[in-house]
Design a protein with these regions (language model features):
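A polyampholytic, Gly/Pro-enriched intrinsically disordered region
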Residues: 85-87, 177, 203-208
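ATP-dependent adenylation/nucleotidyltransferase module used to activate substrates
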Residues: 1-175
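Flexible, glycine-/basic-rich loop-and-beta segments that form/coincide
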Residues: 170, 203, 210-212
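Short, intrinsically disordered, charge-biased short linear motifs at domain edges
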Residues: 172-174, 179-188
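Local cysteine-cluster metal-coordination motifs and their immediate loop/turn environment
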Residues: 104, 183-204
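Short cysteine/histidine-rich metal-coordination sites, predominantly Zn2+-binding motifs
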Residues: 188-189, 209-214
Length: 214
């Protein structure tokens, strides 16, 4: 029996990353999840990520990092998370170079355990406008891998990059992702606020998919 290809999954516990985890398992990858505790106000996503990994019996690592310079309303609790904003420009919830940081950890992990692929649930259709969610960013990072690692042939896969939020939700349902266990809200409350970018994009997706969000 051929050996399964090892894959590193960047898992936040949100809708997109959870769908990516289930997608990778469905494709037959030997999945290893990376979960980040980086001082985000919405720490509930961490417990959601752990639940998703445990449900699929996927080994996971929680990486705790500090970004003391903050630079984002997700990190600075004195700053307000924007609500009901027009989806134009880069919002204050953008964390400087976050995906670059996360992918660097994933790349190191991949090299160390011999993983051939890294999967991230980035999306460039229904998104908040973050520059590190664009296809061009991942194309550039692929060059970083080639030039800066011994392994060189590790691939970064973005299976959701061109899907609408409604399409992601339909894929999640097809893959039997427990959507009720995912967490998308940027606020740190016990219930989703319904008005931050992430909540609104999620609601838009369920509405477009003609489904109710449980």
């Amino acid at each position: 029996m051929p050996k399964k290809v090892k894959a590193i999954i960047l898992l936040s516990g949100g809708l997109d990353s959870s769908t990516t985890l289930y997608y990778a398992k469905n494709k037959g990858y030997d999945c290893h999840a990376l979960i980040f505790d980086y001082g985000q106000r919405h720490k509930r996503e961490i417990s959601s990520a752990v639940v998703q990994a445990k449900r699929l019996k996927v080994p996971y690592e929680i990486i705790k990092i500090k970004l003391p310079w903050k630079g984002s309303s997700l990190l600075d609790k004195k700053a307000k998370v924007p609500t009901n904003r027009k989806m134009k420009g880069i919002p204050s919830t953008y964390v400087p170079a976050r995906n670059t940081i996360f992918l660097s950890f994933a790349l190191s992990y991949a090299e160390a355990i011999g993983a051939k692929v890294i999967l991230i649930g980035a999306n460039a259709v229904d998104f908040s406008g973050y520059p590190d969610c664009r296809p061009s960013f991942y194309e550039a990072f692929q060059k970083v891998i080639k030039e800066g690692t011994k392994a060189q042939k590790i691939k970064v896969l973005t299976p959701l990059i061109d899907l609408s939020k409604a399409e992601i939700i339909k894929l999640a349902i097809k893959l039997k992702v427990p959507l009720e266990l995912t967490w998308s809200c940027y606020q740190g409350g016990k219930k989703p606020c319904g008005v931050c970018d992430s909540c609104r994009l999620r609601d838009k997706g369920f509405t477009s998919a003609f489904l109710g969000d449980s």
